[in-house]
A protein has these predicted regions:
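Extracytoplasmic/periplasmic membrane-proximal domains and adjacent transmembrane bundles
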Residues: 6, 10-11, 15-49, 56, ...
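Helix-loop junctions and hydrophobic alpha-helical segments within the transmembrane domains
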Residues: 26, 33, 37, 113, ...
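Hydrophobic transmembrane alpha-helices and their membrane-interface caps
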Residues: 45, 49-118, 596-683, 688-704, ...
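Transmembrane helices with small-residue packing motifs
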Residues: 84-89, 156-164, 195, 229, ...
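Transmembrane alpha-helices and their membrane-interface boundaries in multi-pass membrane transporters
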Residues: 102-114, 138-157, 164-202, 620, ...
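Signature of alpha-helical transmembrane segments and their immediate interfacial
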Residues: 137, 203-252, 384, 761-778
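Extracytoplasmic/periplasmic
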Residues: 249-332, 391-424, 767-772
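Solvent-exposed, membrane-proximal periplasmic/extracellular interface segments of envelope transport
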Residues: 276-377, 433-446, 450-456
Length: 778
């Protein structure tokens, strides 16, 4: 992005320096970053504003709303300071982390301020309500924050691509959470003690009715506890089956206002005719509605070498260009930036139709996207490697594999990458005749190469109108062509039997013959085995991993037939390979995070069983995210899988607060089910408030139609639907699991004090007593 800004300034300087120069930028990846940053910043501001609106609705009071509103910029500022001292830049991933953190960082402040506000409503003085309210939920808030931080911890210490993608974002989310914890336990109580002195908590009649209805429904659920539990498990199994059957894609599809057309003209055309066809294609593309700029460059290469600047004679250059299928072009197209995604797709389809109307050429239209840089590091589409030892056999086999892929539904533009091959002149030198003329084969080839190379390496300074330029001199006199090549003469030296030498000349036709042939444009090998790579694009509306299964089945069947040459084998890769790799990484991430989350909850609950109540809601809460993908028609991608990671760190928060508060009531002597109903009704408001603040912060990413939302919408849908479903899990499934697993009330362990040493082992008691007596003044 910074380079893009500098280049814009340089471009203006160049225009001022050279009058009449016209510069058109056809491709600019800095625009993607700019769009992403603007979209994420908008989401941050909208999310913060909506969070304040939610607080105002539920609390119906400006003062506590302002307290939480002040905590948002304080927490963000604290997180940005931590980012600065740890060397994190403000980029797309870190800003995405801050955007997610906006919705999560108010959770702690909401829980604390709601509890303080509730105590004020019961008549507790402001100062005492601030201290007591923060103390009641303090440990559960600390535990819920630490569990969320632990979920993102594996990404920081990972050594794979996951760290590069999620490491900065995970650190930003962790910084936001830790900042929100500090602010919630310090700034919020301190501000509440002052701001809420004269506050008069208002009754919410509509919410009281909702609480009463929830209490009655929870009592019925506890009486028939296995019915909702079984329904939740069955729904989870169904969603997992449906999503897996749909397949997983690497990255979501994204559109941009840039496209590239790969154009090939018919080989029989001359250079001028090829240029004429290319001009017609450009005119046809320019006529498409929405196209602003078009740039075209020739792709005249031979076996990967540019031959346009080697200084070869024109006849040889023409021969090489024709041999390589001269007439290959790259056309860059820039569309109107105001076009929506659907109109950009329509414009690309219109360009395909327009190019199809031009004779003597074939072309493919490909959109650029924000994910192109990432997909360049990972394989996309379908890739099949065919191994063997003979180039001709591999070429023939690859053509059959191309036919198999093209006949498989869901793939298009399958190719073996070999093309038609390059036309070559094969010179066959007769070694006996060469030796008879006193020459060597190496001398023959060296003289032919010297004749072909007509450009001197030395540069001659030439001054034109006061401007000095270095030029290379090219000798185009007597050019070597296919017709006169065999007339090339060589000086010979022949020694007779009596020891005398005789000099003379011979023509190339006297010692060699030539034929024409076709050579492959590339030869690749791996572990000393040659291979050909067949690639194909996934057609719109199809899933690569699902369709690749059909291709593999067809290849396995082909391998059992007599058409499969001996010594050849297939190896499938591409996007399915990358998907499997990323899925394994994500599963390992979750597997590493769960033990950390469990240990934090063990320390909080002082129980090995209580954490399982909360952990059991994690896979059930995934049901919400999967349902969201199914209902919106989204595919499971690597980005949406990150949403499940975020979900795993957030769904446990409300469960921790619920179980902790229920334990406090039961230790106070309340009956089990009565304590669960009372806990549900008491914690219902902060649970709904924290859920809504996070959900509303994500809505901007879902309903916006910009390019950034196309990339992040899958993750936002998973978080929104997952948290919404997790709210039901917390309000119903957590009480049901608690009722099943905890028949006895939790023990209230009295750890005593320093003055009471009766329960302390003798050695420790003597040590403490000795330290106390030594500290007393004599």
């Amino acid at each position: 992005y910074e380079i893009h800004e500098r280049l814009v300034g340089s471009e203006m300087c160049i225009r001022d320096r050279y009058e009449g120069l016209h510069v058109v930028v056809l491709s600019n990846q800095g625009n993607y970053i700019s769009i992403l940053i603007k979209s994420i910043l908008t989401s941050m501001l909208v999310g913060a504003a909506l969070a304040i609106v939610v607080l105002a609705i539920f609390l119906k009071d400006v003062k506590p709303t302002l307290v939480v509103g002040v905590s948002i910029p304080l927490s963000v500022l604290f997180a940005v300071v931590l980012m600065y001292f740890t060397g994190l830049d403000l980029n797309v991933m870190t800003l995405a982390g801050l955007s997610l953190g906006i919705g999560m960082l108010v959770d702690n402040s909401v829980v604390v301020i709601e509890n303080i506000y509730r105590l004020r409503g019961r008549g507790v003085p402001a100062a005492r309500a601030a201290v007591q309210g923060a103390r009641q939920v303090g440990m559960s808030v600390v535990a819920s924050t630490l569990t969320s931080v632990c979920v993102f911890l594996p990404a920081v210490f990972s050594a794979s691509l996951i760290r590069n993608l999620m490491g900065p974002m995970s650190l930003c989310i962790g910084y936001c959470l830790m900042a929100s914890l500090i602010v919630a336990l310090t700034v919020v109580p301190a501000a509440s003690a002052t701001v809420l002195k004269n506050a008069q908590p208002k009754k919410l009649a509509w919410f009281d009715k909702i609480q009463d209805a929830y209490g009655r429904s929870l009592e019925k659920a506890l009486k028939n506890r296995f019915v909702p539990l079984a329904a939740a498990v069955l729904l989870l199994v169904f969603c997992c089956w449906r999503v897996v059957s749909m397949g997983i894609v690497l990255l979501p599809t994204s559109t941009s206002n840039e496209a590239m057309i790969t154009l090939s003209t018919t080989d029989t055309l001359s250079k001028e005719e090829s240029y004429d066809v290319a001009g017609k294609v450009v005119q046809a593309v320019m006529a498409v509605d929405g196209v602003e700029e078009v740039g075209i460059t020739p792709d005249n290469t031979v076996a990967g070498m540019d031959v346009s600047n080697l200084g070869l004679p024109s006849t040889i250059t023409d021969l090489l260009n024709a041999a390589n299928g001269y007439g290959k072009y790259k056309i860059n197209v820039k569309l109107n930036e105001e076009l929506s995604s659907s109109k950009i797709d329509a414009a690309c389809k219109a360009m395909e139709d327009a190019v199809a109307g031009v004779a003597d050429c074939t072309a493919t239209v490909q959109q650029y996207g924000m994910t192109d840089d990432l997909t360049s590091q990972l394989s996309t589409g379908l890739t099949i490697k065919i191994y063997g030892t003979d180039a001709e056999t591999l070429t023939a086999l690859s053509e059959k594999v191309v036919d198999i892929v093209n006949n498989t539904e869901g793939f298009q533009n399958a190719t073996n990458g070999l093309g038609a091959g390059d036309s070559t002149i094969i010179l066959q030198v007769d070694r006996d005749k060469v030796r008879a003329n006193g020459l060597t084969v190496a001398q023959v080839y060296q003289q032919i190469a010297a004749k072909l190379t007509t450009t001197t390496t030395a540069q001659t300074p030439v001054t034109v109108d006061g401007t000095t330029m270095d030029v290379q001199i090219s000798n185009n006199l007597d050019p070597l062509t296919k017709e006169n090549m065999m007339d090339m003469t060589f000086e010979t030296t022949v020694m007779s039997a009596d020891g005398t030498t005789a000099t003379g000349t011979c023509k190339l036709s006297d010692i060699a013959s030539w034929t024409t042939g076709t050579a492959p444009d590339s030869i690749t090998s791996e572990n000393r085995n040659q291979f050909v790579t067949v690639t194909a694009e996934t057609a719109p509306g199809y899933n690569t991993t699902v369709q690749a299964r059909a291709v593999k089945k067809a290849l396995d069947a082909f391998a059992l037939t007599d058409e499969m040459p001996e010594g050849c084998s297939f190896s499938m890769g591409g996007e399915s390979d990358s998907v499997n790799y990323m899925t394994d990484e994500m599963i390992q991430w979750m597997a590493l995070a769960l033990p950390f989350v469990y240990l934090v909850m063990v320390a909080q609950f002082q129980s090995l069983l209580s954490p399982f109540i909360v952990l059991f809601t994690v896979p059930l809460a995934f049901t919400g995210g999967l349902l969201g993908l199914l209902l919106t028609g989204q595919q499971l991608t690597m980005i949406s899988m990150m949403g499940f990671i975020v979900l795993m760190g957030t769904v446990v928060n409300n469960g921790i607060v619920f179980v902790d508060y229920a334990n406090q009531l039961r230790m106070g002597g309340m009956e089990r089910r009565a304590a669960l109903v009372a806990t549900g009704k008491t914690r219902m408001r902060p649970i709904l408030m924290t859920t809504l603040t996070t959900v509303l912060a994500m809505l901007q990413m879902v309903f916006s139609n910009d390019m950034a939302s196309q990339l992040m919408s899958g993750m936002a849908i998973v978080i929104i639907c997952g948290l919404s479903y997790a709210t039901l899990m917390t309000l119903y499934i957590v009480p049901i699991l608690y009722d099943i697993l905890f028949k006895k009330p939790p023990l209230n362990v009295d750890i005593g004090s320093d003055k009471d040493l009766d329960d302390i082992p003798d050695d420790a008691a003597e040590f403490i007593a000795a330290q106390s007596s030594a500290a007393q003044p004599q």
